[in-house]
Amino acid sequence: MARVKRGVTAHAKHKKVYKAAKGFRGRRKNTIRAAKAAVDKAGQYAFRDRKRKKRTFRALWIQRINAAVRPFGMTYSVFINGLSKSGIVVDRKVLSDLAITEPAAFQAIAEKAKAALAA
């Protein structure tokens, strides 16, 4: 059986790691051992933060809604309760966007929620 030299394969593997490590600082971009570790860790952070991003954005939407309903004399939790009682089904992302881009539409929703609480 013929001897197989691994130079081409190893070079291709290293090239792949270096490409992924592009933009890293110091030895992490140009020594294979450090670059591999850095790329692996970057992948772990990316995986974790894709999950975390969903939580972060939901928290942001809730903060925006809370700030937008305060002028109407309500807190976020009271507003959400009013929405469910009035039968309005709008998610937090849309509510947050409405509060920023279309204050008049958001005000109408807030008033309906407040009316549902009073009834």
From Swiss-Prot:
It comes from the Bacteria. Signal peptide: none annotated. One of its GO terms (cellular component) is ribosome. InterPro entries: Ribosomal_bL20, RIBOSOMAL_L20_CS, Ribosomal_protein_bL20_C. GO terms for molecular function: rRNA binding; structural constituent of ribosome. The keyword Ribonucleoprotein applies. Belongs to the bacterial ribosomal protein bL20 family. HAMAP family: Ribosomal_bL20. This is Large ribosomal subunit protein bL20. It comes from Rhodopseudomonas palustris (strain HaA2).
